[in-house]
Amino acid sequence: MNDFTLNAQVRSDLGKGASRRLRRNAALVPAVIYGGNNAPQSISILAKDFAKLLENEASFSHVLNLNVDGQNESVLIKALQRHPAKGFVLHADFVRVVAGHKLTATVPLHFINQETSVGVKKQGGEILHNLNEVEVSCMPQDLPEFIEVDMANVEVGQVLHMTDIKLPKGVELVALAHGSDLPVANVHAPRVSKEDAPKEEDAAE
């Protein structure tokens, strides 16, 4: 069993009441698998195993192996419903990954060279992240665990857009395919405090 494998079992007792009983009595997370050429399938997963998997950021952008009563399913995490106060998972949606067909998935952005960025180190600016993740389209074998955004040469006042990101081979950004070149990050000038602001008499001189 690797880090991206989960054991699951088919569930036939459906509905909100059944889901509550699963979570309360058996510490199981109710979930559903859909997509591909097969019908949706309701399953349950051990809550502690799922929680451990989710500790790894890569689990959200990695093809997972679901072992459902001995039958393997390649899936992606599509959506999680969490408890509003305690944060644990109440329900999960998985979408099937079909070999030979492109998939869409949300991938985290990793920003590198921030402290040594021209706009920060030489110009005293501050970096602001507009996005922390992006939706990508690619073949299953090309799905990256994360995408790097290099901030090394970004200056104060400069905005980095999606078209500025160097993408891994075979990976496309869904937003760009729809004509939206969204801002990803920028370096803005440092805020000037009242103490540092020039006084009126100084400005008059």
Curated annotation (Swiss-Prot):
<keyword id="KW-0699">rRNA-binding</keyword>
<comment type="function">
    <text>This is one of the proteins that binds to the 5S RNA in the ribosome where it forms part of the central protuberance.</text>
</comment>
<dbReference type="Pfam" id="PF01386">
    <property type="entry name" value="Ribosomal_L25p"/>
</dbReference>
<dbReference type="Pfam" id="PF14693">
    <property type="entry name" value="Ribosomal_TL5_C"/>
</dbReference>
<protein>
    <recommendedName>
        <fullName>Large ribosomal subunit protein bL25</fullName>
    </recommendedName>
</protein>
<comment type="similarity">
    <text>Belongs to the bacterial ribosomal protein bL25 family. CTC subfamily.</text>
</comment>
<comment type="subunit">
    <text>Part of the 50S ribosomal subunit; part of the 5S rRNA/L5/L18/L25 subcomplex. Contacts the 5S rRNA. Binds to the 5S rRNA independently of L5 and L18.</text>
</comment>
<dbReference type="InterPro" id="IPR029751">
    <property type="entry name" value="Ribosomal_L25_dom"/>
</dbReference>
<dbReference type="InterPro" id="IPR001021">
    <property type="entry name" value="Ribosomal_bL25_long"/>
</dbReference>
<dbReference type="InterPro" id="IPR020057">
    <property type="entry name" value="Ribosomal_bL25_b-dom"/>
</dbReference>
<dbReference type="GO" id="GO:0003735">
    <property type="term" value="F:structural constituent of ribosome"/>
</dbReference>
<keyword id="KW-0687">Ribonucleoprotein</keyword>
<dbReference type="InterPro" id="IPR037121">
    <property type="entry name" value="Ribosomal_bL25_C"/>
</dbReference>
<dbReference type="InterPro" id="IPR011035">
    <property type="entry name" value="Ribosomal_bL25/Gln-tRNA_synth"/>
</dbReference>
<dbReference type="GO" id="GO:0006412">
    <property type="term" value="P:translation"/>
</dbReference>
<dbReference type="GO" id="GO:0022625">
    <property type="term" value="C:cytosolic large ribosomal subunit"/>
</dbReference>
<keyword id="KW-0689">Ribosomal protein</keyword>
<keyword id="KW-0694">RNA-binding</keyword>
<dbReference type="GO" id="GO:0008097">
    <property type="term" value="F:5S rRNA binding"/>
</dbReference>
<dbReference type="InterPro" id="IPR020056">
    <property type="entry name" value="Rbsml_bL25/Gln-tRNA_synth_N"/>
</dbReference>
<dbReference type="InterPro" id="IPR020930">
    <property type="entry name" value="Ribosomal_uL5_bac-type"/>
</dbReference>
